[in-house]
């Protein structure tokens, strides 16, 4: 492990166009449940009788707007979550002009909360909301502080600005993400299984020098990586910062 940390530190220190790609594992340490792993949010809400995929779908929003709104308020508004050391480390490297930014599969908005400026949120963010009817914009604090569920302009359902099942990923976000990956000298993957498509397929466009994967479990890209660390990323980053 120590040799891996030394290699990681050397690569990070010698890179000046790092792109980060993050998944659910990064946010677990902040108290955000992993949507897919055992014991995660998907397992918890599937006990309610409807599939998690349906509860997070465009169909559910259209079939039962009230049910969808109530589900979002009950299950998705992570009020007390704060960035952890991994989010802070990524933001610091961007401030130091070593990083092109971060691409994330997460919807919790914690990268922005940590101070990262160049964040591409592939699946949207819970930091923004909008009316499903008239598209008036709302902030997360608007929704939480006022327990706001319906638009004060037209009465429509206020939904989070996330990509639901049955919706397309935002193409400008995909293009920016591809640009980050194609121009990176080092790509650091953190806390992602790299199996959820099409987001994970973006990794195949990396042509730089160093692909680093830090994840508890194996990924389909491990064999192509310069360095693979199967460990808890919070522990890895803490150790790295004390090297």
UniProtKB/Swiss-Prot annotation:
<feature type="binding site">
    <location>
        <position position="24"/>
    </location>
    <ligand>
        <name>NAD(+)</name>
    </ligand>
</feature>
<dbReference type="GO" id="GO:0008270">
    <property type="term" value="F:zinc ion binding"/>
</dbReference>
<feature type="binding site">
    <location>
        <position position="215"/>
    </location>
    <ligand>
        <name>NAD(+)</name>
    </ligand>
</feature>
<protein>
    <recommendedName>
        <fullName>NAD-dependent protein deacetylase</fullName>
        <ecNumber>2.3.1.286</ecNumber>
    </recommendedName>
</protein>
<comment type="function">
    <text>NAD-dependent protein deacetylase which modulates the activities of several enzymes which are inactive in their acetylated form.</text>
</comment>
<feature type="binding site">
    <location>
        <position position="105"/>
    </location>
    <ligand>
        <name>NAD(+)</name>
    </ligand>
</feature>
<dbReference type="InterPro" id="IPR026591">
    <property type="entry name" value="Sirtuin_cat_small_dom_sf"/>
</dbReference>
<feature type="binding site">
    <location>
        <position position="192"/>
    </location>
    <ligand>
        <name>NAD(+)</name>
    </ligand>
</feature>
<feature type="active site" description="Proton acceptor">
    <location>
        <position position="123"/>
    </location>
</feature>
<keyword id="KW-0479">Metal-binding</keyword>
<feature type="binding site">
    <location>
        <position position="232"/>
    </location>
    <ligand>
        <name>NAD(+)</name>
    </ligand>
</feature>
<feature type="binding site">
    <location>
        <position position="123"/>
    </location>
    <ligand>
        <name>NAD(+)</name>
    </ligand>
</feature>
<feature type="domain" description="Deacetylase sirtuin-type">
    <location>
        <begin position="1"/>
        <end position="243"/>
    </location>
</feature>
<feature type="binding site">
    <location>
        <position position="193"/>
    </location>
    <ligand>
        <name>NAD(+)</name>
    </ligand>
</feature>
<keyword id="KW-0963">Cytoplasm</keyword>
<keyword id="KW-0520">NAD</keyword>
<feature type="binding site">
    <location>
        <position position="131"/>
    </location>
    <ligand>
        <name>Zn(2+)</name>
    </ligand>
</feature>
<dbReference type="Pfam" id="PF02146">
    <property type="entry name" value="SIR2"/>
</dbReference>
<feature type="binding site">
    <location>
        <position position="108"/>
    </location>
    <ligand>
        <name>NAD(+)</name>
    </ligand>
</feature>
<dbReference type="InterPro" id="IPR050134">
    <property type="entry name" value="NAD-dep_sirtuin_deacylases"/>
</dbReference>
<feature type="binding site">
    <location>
        <position position="154"/>
    </location>
    <ligand>
        <name>Zn(2+)</name>
    </ligand>
</feature>
<feature type="binding site">
    <location>
        <position position="151"/>
    </location>
    <ligand>
        <name>Zn(2+)</name>
    </ligand>
</feature>
<keyword id="KW-0808">Transferase</keyword>
<dbReference type="GO" id="GO:0005737">
    <property type="term" value="C:cytoplasm"/>
</dbReference>
<feature type="binding site">
    <location>
        <position position="36"/>
    </location>
    <ligand>
        <name>NAD(+)</name>
    </ligand>
</feature>
<feature type="binding site">
    <location>
        <position position="35"/>
    </location>
    <ligand>
        <name>nicotinamide</name>
    </ligand>
</feature>
<dbReference type="InterPro" id="IPR026590">
    <property type="entry name" value="Ssirtuin_cat_dom"/>
</dbReference>
<dbReference type="GO" id="GO:0017136">
    <property type="term" value="F:histone deacetylase activity, NAD-dependent"/>
</dbReference>
<feature type="binding site">
    <location>
        <position position="107"/>
    </location>
    <ligand>
        <name>nicotinamide</name>
    </ligand>
</feature>
<feature type="binding site">
    <location>
        <position position="107"/>
    </location>
    <ligand>
        <name>NAD(+)</name>
    </ligand>
</feature>
<feature type="binding site">
    <location>
        <position position="108"/>
    </location>
    <ligand>
        <name>nicotinamide</name>
    </ligand>
</feature>
<comment type="similarity">
    <text>Belongs to the sirtuin family. Class U subfamily.</text>
</comment>
<dbReference type="InterPro" id="IPR028628">
    <property type="entry name" value="Sirtuin_class_U"/>
</dbReference>
<feature type="binding site">
    <location>
        <position position="134"/>
    </location>
    <ligand>
        <name>Zn(2+)</name>
    </ligand>
</feature>
<dbReference type="GO" id="GO:0070403">
    <property type="term" value="F:NAD+ binding"/>
</dbReference>
<feature type="binding site">
    <location>
        <position position="35"/>
    </location>
    <ligand>
        <name>NAD(+)</name>
    </ligand>
</feature>
<dbReference type="InterPro" id="IPR003000">
    <property type="entry name" value="Sirtuin"/>
</dbReference>
<keyword id="KW-0862">Zinc</keyword>
<dbReference type="InterPro" id="IPR029035">
    <property type="entry name" value="DHS-like_NAD/FAD-binding_dom"/>
</dbReference>
